[in-house]
Amino acid sequence: MPVVTRLIRLKCVGLRLDRSGLNRRICHGGHGESTRRRVMEELSSLTVSQREQFLVENDVFGIYNYFDASDVSTQKYMMEIQRDKQLDYLMKGLRQLGPQFSSLDANRPWLCYWILHSIALLGETVDDELESNAIDFLGRCQGSEGGYGGGPGQLPHLATTYAAVNALVTLGGDKALSSINREKMSCFLRRMKDTSGGFRMHDMGEMDVRACYTAISVASILNIMDDELTQGLGDYILSCQTYEGGIGGEPGSEAHGGYTYCGLAAMILINEVDRLNLDSLMNWAVHRQGVEMGFQGRTNKLVDGCYTFWQAAPCVLLQRLYSTNDHDVHGSSHISEGTNEEHHAHDEDDLEDSDDDDDSDEDNDEDSVNGHRIHHTSTYINRRMQLVFDSLGLQRYVLLCSKIPDGGFRDKPRKPRDFYHTCYCLSGLSVAQHAWLKDEDTPPLTRDIMGGYSNLLEPVQLLHNIVMDQYNEAIEFFFKAA
């Protein structure tokens, strides 16, 4: 349908601009030639980016308006996560992929991770045969000198190494975890280390914040992190923080949601997060949630379901960091003394419970951020502190605009589903549901879950995007293996 005709059928006769970009204004005007001319004039005055934003908002608010005008039973159906259909879509993908996926031949560990993690988020597991097949396949992707390639016999690469390790951790159990060669992995990570402090994605490959994060995430999970891997890393990531506040892929690049998550998580894992300008980072991150209630990846870009995780996770991490440092969400003042004591008492109890075996690792400097606190989700956002993003609005966008009723999730309306967006939409949905999480054993309140408890997903470990139970199992396993 021509754009102008579709707009007239929506009775839209005007546009307005505000701080969040192009918004539509619905007016109940006529459908005559004068209306057509006004719409044509409005459209001709817009840039390509404005037109694209306008059309996305039309689609999104059309869905929202339909939902709001529907009866209760229809609303309930639209808001349901449709677990059975999601699992059917995921299981089919794990067993057999069509020829259209041949272009992703170098990303096969990613497909394993995206699908297995999505299944785990839904609280389900795969059968023994599928588990054994996945472990065997990923074992054939493991290089003879460490790391994992995109497929059997392919060049080891940090991105697919991260995906393979996360997939095996998600499967869990001795067979999966013991299949990872920690000694050769340590050698591989050292080989990827650059003298600048950063990491290269593969031998002679590009260097960016993705490489830094994936290397440190793997080293942290496998308990092989040391000073050689972390030396100079904070300097490199710090050089990638932009004037906007977010983090780019490399020095001088534009701030981007995915790189911001990678940079922030890596800095927390190496206990150097205080070196970042957290106020500026927080300001940039919260302004990426637009009128659609989903997140965009960069300034003046369209909403995308995958940033449900890449942007919401940094928002929660930052707010927990402020709680740890006794600041409010703006970092400009201290929270009340009583709340401060309550936080520290809770934190210390959790740390004593979780880290009895290695008290020497505790940081005695009360002003520094301890990565263990974020690791074990022992710091939480007090109810007296308002969330810095709209968690219910974000869930609304994912469930109404990204979810496909027959299974899977997508970028935005009119886009097809895929396993990548399914993984990160579900991951972000979990982050939004558990944003108020007091500890990993406390379920969120009903009011924090759009659609009720039937939509509740498993909580994720925010620094690795692994379901908490599997993360805890892996940490214990690799602690004993050291």
From Swiss-Prot:
Binds 1 zinc ion per subunit. PFTB repeats lie at residues 131-172, 182-223, 230-271, 278-319, 391-433. Zn(2+) binds at D304, C306, H421. GO terms for biological process: cuticle development; negative regulation of abscisic acid-activated signaling pathway; protein farnesylation; protein prenylation; regulation of meristem structural organization; regulation of response to osmotic stress; regulation of response to salt stress; response to abscisic acid. Its EC number is 2.5.1.58. GO terms for molecular function: geranylgeranyl diphosphate synthase activity; protein farnesyltransferase activity; zinc ion binding. It is an enzyme of class 2 (transferase). Residues 348-368 have a biased composition (Acidic residues). Its cofactor is Zn(2+). Residues 329-372 are annotated as: Disordered. It catalyses: L-cysteinyl-[protein] + (2E,6E)-farnesyl diphosphate = S-(2E,6E)-farnesyl-L-cysteinyl-[protein] + diphosphate. Catalyzes the transfer of a farnesyl moiety from farnesyl diphosphate to a cysteine at the fourth position from the C-terminus of several proteins having the C-terminal sequence Cys-aliphatic-aliphatic-X (CaaX). The beta subunit is responsible for peptide-binding. Acts as an abscisic acid (ABA) negative regulator by mediating ASG2 farnesylation and consequently monitoring its subcellular localization. Involved in responses to salt (NaCl) and osmotic (e.g. in response to mannitol and PEG) stresses. Heterodimer of FTA and FTB (farnesyltransferase). Heterodimer of an alpha and a beta subunit. This is Protein farnesyltransferase subunit beta. It comes from Arabidopsis thaliana (Mouse-ear cress).
